[in-house]
């Protein structure tokens, strides 16, 4: 029996184009492949939608189109995405076939195209006797999102935080006892749920490991389902054990930057004791993510922009606070004007200045200054002298400056300290030198090489 498994459609005004293009393609493809049953495993909407919202109308149109070709089971997803009651109206939108909304923990049998739900969490022995001889096409074990508030009210807040997995594992084990009977009778068994498997990988490549996740693989396989169809994680992944399969189809489209892998839906072939699943890719958005450790490389961005076309582009960089103005955002926007969308993100690194080690241990300003000079390899004497000036008044500082200027004015000139060689010449040489001068002219008083023009005629 062939199943079409969709999940995480996330219809909303912002996602409408992506969601409807991808889900519309998936519905058409599933119908063309001849799928017998459709399963939507949660998060059909991204948040609360008004009745007149175009995104809700588009979702209803596609689900109705799917129900004209096959029975459809819709599971309650995350409450923040699908507020309780959101899916109730979809049960009234069936076409040729029925749409069943699984919003409580239960088992559901599909008999001649009609869904029959258990009274309690699992089928009782009396209920099994009523239909087991009829040979249902499939029996679903439905485990929608659990309200942790209700769980906390019954078992306590502390236990609800880490004990949710144990509570769900107990239910899956109970369902497994029923599913073993069904498999022994040749009836297909399929689990449908919405949550996180411990150890799975998100669409951004992060491994989900912790104590507060809903499921473990051991608990899921203990449900004894031939196929277990999951939702919530946006990355397609599968786990197999003894021919039985647990799988996420991932989100129907690409809603965030940095998501890894193809987007699509799973087409399942399920028989008692075995199952296979194949991803059918949808025409999701093409996104380009460019990250720089420093300022963006404009030459590289030009190369990327040349092939960006109608893609969605995100450019991120990090830069220190003092150089944030060197990045021309407008130039980057102009480069990618032909792209479908551009998102620029700058991470500004604050300038961090570390204090001198041990400076806080000094009790005086003089000591702190000496400590800083020691660490910075700076001569401390001039700085200490100027620090002492701060204790004086402005008039005292000005008087000290004037006193130094006056002392410099009375210092002997360089000509006196270093007399010209002619002053120490012998007497004869001095007289000859005077006779050489023509009459009526006078020799310069001194040949001071610091003051006279040496190149005068």
What are these regions (language model features)?
Residues 106-137, 244-316:
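Binuclear metal-dependent phosphoesterase catalytic core
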Residues 85, 89-213, 424, 432:
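Conserved catalytic scaffold of divalent metal-dependent phosphoesterases
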Residues 270-457:
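Accessory, non-catalytic peripheral segments of nucleic-acid enzymes
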Residues 12-14, 46-49, 75-87, 108-111, ...:
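Active-site environment of divalent metal-dependent phosphoester hydrolases
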Residues 8, 23, 43, 59, ...:
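Divalent metal-coordination and catalytic microenvironments
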Residues 15-112, 124, 217, 221-225:
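Core catalytic region of metal-dependent phosphoesterases/phosphodiesterases
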Residues 1-4:
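Extreme N-terminal starter segment of soluble prokaryotic enzymes
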Residues 92-97, 197-272:
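Conserved beta-sheet core of the metallophosphoesterase superfamily
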């Amino acid at each position: 029996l062939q199943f079409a498994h969709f999940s995480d459609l996330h219809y909303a005004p912002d996602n409408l184009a992506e969601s409807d293009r991808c889900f519309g393609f998936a519905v058409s493809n599933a119908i063309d492949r001849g799928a017998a049953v459709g399963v939507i495993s949660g998060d059909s909407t991204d948040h609360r939608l008004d009745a007149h919202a175009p995104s809700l109308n588009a979702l209803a149109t596609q689900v109705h189109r799917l129900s004209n070709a096959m029975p459809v089971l819709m599971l309650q997803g995350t409450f923040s995405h699908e507020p309780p009651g959101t899916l109730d109206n979809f049960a009234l939108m069936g076409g040729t076939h029925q749409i069943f909304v699984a919003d409580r923990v239960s088992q559901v049998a599909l008999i001649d195209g009609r869904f029959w739900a258990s009274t309690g969490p699992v089928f009782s022995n009396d209920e099994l006797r009523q239909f087991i001889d009829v040979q249902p096409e499939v029996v679903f074990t439905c485990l929608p999102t659990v309200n942790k508030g209700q769980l906390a009210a019954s078992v306590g807040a502390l236990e609800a935080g880490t004990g949710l997995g144990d509570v769900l594992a107990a239910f899956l084990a109970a369902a497994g006892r029923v599913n073993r009977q069904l498999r022994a009778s040749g009836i297909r068994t399929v689990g449908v749920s919405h949550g996180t498997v411990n150890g799975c990988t998100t669409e951004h490549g992060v491994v989900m490991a912790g104590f507060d996740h809903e499921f473990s693989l051991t608990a899921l396989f203990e449900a004894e389902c031939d196929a277990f169809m999951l939702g919530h994680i946006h990355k397609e992944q599968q786990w197999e054990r003894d021919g039985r399969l647990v799988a996420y189809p991932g989100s129907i489209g690409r809603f965030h930057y940095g998501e890894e892998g193809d987007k699509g839906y799973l087409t399942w072939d399920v028989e008692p004791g075995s199952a296979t699943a194949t991803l059918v890719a949808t025409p999701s958005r093409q996104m380009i993510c460019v990250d720089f450790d420093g300022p963006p490389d404009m030459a590289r961005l030009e190369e990327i922009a040349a092939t960006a076309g109608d893609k969605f582009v995100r450019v991120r960089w990090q830069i220190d606070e003092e150089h944030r103005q060197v990045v021309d955002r407008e130039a980057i926007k102009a480069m990618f004007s032909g792209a479908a969308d551009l998102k620029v993100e700058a991470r500004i690194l604050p300038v961090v200045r570390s204090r001198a080690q041990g400076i806080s241990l000094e009790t005086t300003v003089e000591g702190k200054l000496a400590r800083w000079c020691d660490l910075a390899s700076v001569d401390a004497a001039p700085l200490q002298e100027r620090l002492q000036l701060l204790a004086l008044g402005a008039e005292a500082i000005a008087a000290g400056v004037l006193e130094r200027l006056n002392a410099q004015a009375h210092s002997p000139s360089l000509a006196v300290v270093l007399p010209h060689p002619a002053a120490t010449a012998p007497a004869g040489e001095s007289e000859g030198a005077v006779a050489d001068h023509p009459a009526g002219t006078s020799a310069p008083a001194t040949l001071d090489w610091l003051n006279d023009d040496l190149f005068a005629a």
